[in-house]
């Protein structure tokens, strides 16, 4: 670790796929409480800008931090990627403090699309922020557009809070020129912020929250000490369904269960977690997980790898102490209990956006202060990989699991999805057969539409057959290469439970690079949040899908795009009753 005079921390990570990865601690949407919710997220969208033909890049805003990364591709170099990311924050050597009202307006529209996307695919319920005075969703809404001047002032104010002590930088390589460049830019920031934000309200413990969830989960408040962080790292590397959450200076260990009986036994104090020592902790974490640790605990004074001897040699005492602290918090009700609930009618409170939720007090009734049994945890495997065809009945459940777990990755091709994970076969089966997970998987049907229409366009099966078997979608034809013939109509309107645009497009010069560039152009116009595309077996032919509340505008953009020599687009309007009648005509597509 290299520390600049103003406390900027720089780490060299040659295993990282990104060229540069930058994080800002104490800079997430928890700072929006008592201001306009969404300022942090809006700032993230305003800052990031790049040429998608020579860079891959992204940014994210969480409860307590913001992070940005950039990677060079094609003709660009690592140095180009570093300078591009730095340019998001600095202009002519000075920290950016000016944002145009037109740009703010476009990005607020994009935020509303992101809200729609996340609520269609996920259940966006941030319990900790809600209990601390925020909302269940804190990413920004369209009503911010009514206060553009106030929003702009808040954005400038937020930029002035950036300080060297908040900055963490990962780079693949660090030569003298790059180090000098960092000194001239991020190294010029004050060591402490010029504007000190007000303290975040203390979140409420001893609560039961009933909300959509794939698991029975409890957040256990523990002290944010070095040993407890090392204990969390130990548990995270060894077991599934264990993680942590932070808000302000508070730390919660999150433990999830698939069995309600074990869950309630743990909450009553009847049982403790069965934590066993593994052979060795390697700290082989992803760069995302490492960055999150440094940002959530900015007081860490060493490289995490400096603690690898301690975490292995002292693991027994670290885990015993952590286990005792967990049990004490259970008994003292320093916990937030999350019960899966999918009833739209059950509600006793709402946030300011009128999202319904049930919040109750966690009482001491039935507590047993002497545990007499232990609960085994799901152990991680080194690596596992499966391929699921689009005709497999487990397709949607696997997609739901990957969306709810950050350490599961999936990649689509024309025949199915390839899933990388670290579960045992028995554990993954137990999760997918659990009552709460099945209800969660079925509670958000929007994600299924992407695969219903992918199956329709790529298989030649009728929409009636596909809808009849929508829980498994129909298997694609794999014996022969499909030849897709486009009909006369370019647009077909349907009614579903979601608002989206999808379809197939073909073009002689069409490739993934041009589609990514198209997606970013649509994002800049505020028309979409993201766009998925799958390369079909037919040459230069892709399937596109994007959730959007601006369906006509997106259709007009795609319909007039000169890259497409042929297209067949479906525009879905959200309604209570599905109507696919326009797709039953044989003129749509032939295989």
From Swiss-Prot:
Example of a GO MF term: zinc ion binding
Swiss-Prot/TrEMBL cofactor(s): Zn(2+)
Keywords tagged on the record: Hydrolase, Late protein, Metal-binding, Metalloprotease, Protease, Virion, Zinc
Pfam families: Peptidase_M44
Subcellular location: Virion
KW Protein transport (keyword) present: no
Processing and modification events after translation: Undergoes proteolytic processing during the course of infection. May be cleaved into 46 kDa and 22 kDa products (Potential).
Residues the entry annotates as binding Zn(2+): 41, 45, 112
EC numbers on record: 3.4.24.-
Residues annotated as catalytic: 44
Domain of life according to the entry: Viruses
Annotated GO CC locations: virion component
Disulphide bonds in the chain: none
Any GO BP: viral life cycle
Predominant location category: virion
Homology family: Belongs to the peptidase M44 family.
Its job: Probably involved in maturation of some viral proteins by processing them preferentially at Ala-Gly-|-Ser/Thr/Lys motifs. Does not seem to be responsible for the cleavage of major core proteins.
Protein name, entry field: Metalloendopeptidase OPG085
Provenance organism: Variola virus (isolate Human/India/Ind3/1967)
Gene coding for it: OPG085
